[in-house]
């Protein structure tokens, strides 16, 4: 049985979970994640303590607990378990308070709390823009895009666009490159005026064939030779047009998004 990991927070737990994933990914081990958000009272802290102790009995080993609890009383209750408790405040915030000689707000995940902030509104606007301009659905207002992702079908354009919008408030459109474009030897007409905003995604042809076969098994669309043709043509077109691009084959969405932001020199803070 994989080790149990609790993500305990008095809010959504997004910050704690992101941190936990970053740390746990360093180990070649599967983990069973148990999310415990909104622990905003001592009663809920005691209920969480009970869950942790139950896991100890069931697993025969102590679990790992990542916590971002602001309330010291609730935090002490959770720390009363026999688990390995990793307190993000104690580990990182308190030493920074001493170094900076300042008291922190002790409000983990502040950026997620106020739905009326300008940043929140910008993010929602970016998400709506990316959804409206997914897969070339609309050519309207392409001039408003921060970036336009191009590439063959199933090369990772849609998830990357949405990740950029949700995490960074980037207005990311995406547009497919199709066989008709390769036959003409030109970019799709609606994109011609926006070369400076374009960024390309490619992918290993064999991997592309596997992905497409999940969607349309046995089709020409998914055939290895067709995938090789489309990728070769797409990469040749991007080189001709001076479009920066990368292969998404062995990269996570986070890595792809970070590279795009660096390449197009767009400075945005993650929400």
UniProtKB/Swiss-Prot annotation:
Positions bound to ADP: 151-158
Transmembrane regions = none
Could you cite one Gene Ontology molecular function of this protein? ADP binding
List keywords of the entry alphabetically: Kinase, Nucleotide-binding, Serine/threonine-protein kinase, Transferase
Its domain of life reads Bacteria
Q: Per UniProt, what is one Pfam family of this protein?
A: Kinase-PPPase
For this protein, what is the EC number? 2.7.11.33, 2.7.4.28
Q: Note the InterPro entries from the entry.
A: Kinase-pyrophosphorylase, PSRP
Q: What class of enzyme is it?
A: transferase
Q: What's its catalytic activity?
A: [pyruvate, water dikinase] + ADP = [pyruvate, water dikinase]-phosphate + AMP + H(+); [pyruvate, water dikinase]-phosphate + phosphate + H(+) = [pyruvate, water dikinase] + diphosphate
The answer on whether this UniProt entry bears the keyword Flavoprotein reads: no
- Asked whether the keyword Kinase is assigned, the reply is yes
> What is the documented function of this protein?
Bifunctional serine/threonine kinase and phosphorylase involved in the regulation of the phosphoenolpyruvate synthase (PEPS) by catalyzing its phosphorylation/dephosphorylation.
Supply the NCBIfam families for this chain.
Answer: PRK05339.1 (NF003742)
Task: Supply the PANTHER family for this chain.
Answer: PYRUVATE, PHOSPHATE DIKINASE REGULATORY PROTEIN 1, CHLOROPLASTIC
- According to its UniProt record, which protein family does this protein belong to? Belongs to the pyruvate, phosphate/water dikinase regulatory protein family. PSRP subfamily.
Entry protein name: Putative phosphoenolpyruvate synthase regulatory protein
**Organism field:** Paraburkholderia xenovorans (strain LB400)
């Amino acid at each position: 049985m994989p080790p149990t990991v609790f993500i305990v927070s008095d809010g959504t737990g997004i910050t704690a979970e992101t941190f936990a994933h970053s740390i746990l990914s360093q180990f070649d081990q599967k983990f069973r994640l148990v999310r415990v958000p909104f622990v905003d009272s001592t009663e809920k802290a005691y209920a969480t303590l009970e869950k942790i102790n139950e896991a100890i009995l069931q697993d025969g080993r102590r679990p790992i607990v990542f916590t971002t609890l602001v309330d010291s009383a609730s935090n002490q209750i959770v720390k009363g378990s026999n688990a390995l408790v990793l307190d993000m405040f104690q580990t990182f915030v308190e030493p920074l308070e001493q170094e900076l000689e300042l008291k922190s707000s002790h409000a983990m995940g502040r950026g997620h709390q106020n739905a009326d902030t300008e940043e929140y509104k910008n993010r929602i606007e970016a998400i709506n823009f990316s959804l409206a301009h997914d897969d070339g659905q609309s050519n309207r207002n392409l001039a408003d895009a921060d970036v336009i992702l191009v590439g063959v079908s199933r090369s990772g354009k849609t998830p990357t666009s949405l990740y950029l919008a949700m995490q960074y408030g980037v207005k990311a459109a995406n547009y497919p490159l199709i066989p008709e474009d390769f036959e003409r030897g030109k970019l799709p007409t609606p994109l011609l005026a926006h070369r400076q905003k374009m960024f390309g995604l490619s992918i290993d042809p064999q991997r592309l064939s596997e992905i497409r076969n999940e969607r349309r098994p046995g089709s020409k669309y998914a055939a290895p030779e067709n995938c090789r043709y489309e990728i070769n043509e797409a990469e040749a077109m991007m080189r001709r047009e001076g479009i920066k691009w990368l292969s998404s084959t062995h990269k996570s969405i986070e890595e792809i998004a970070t590279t795009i932001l660096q390449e197009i020199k767009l400075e945005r803070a993650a929400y």
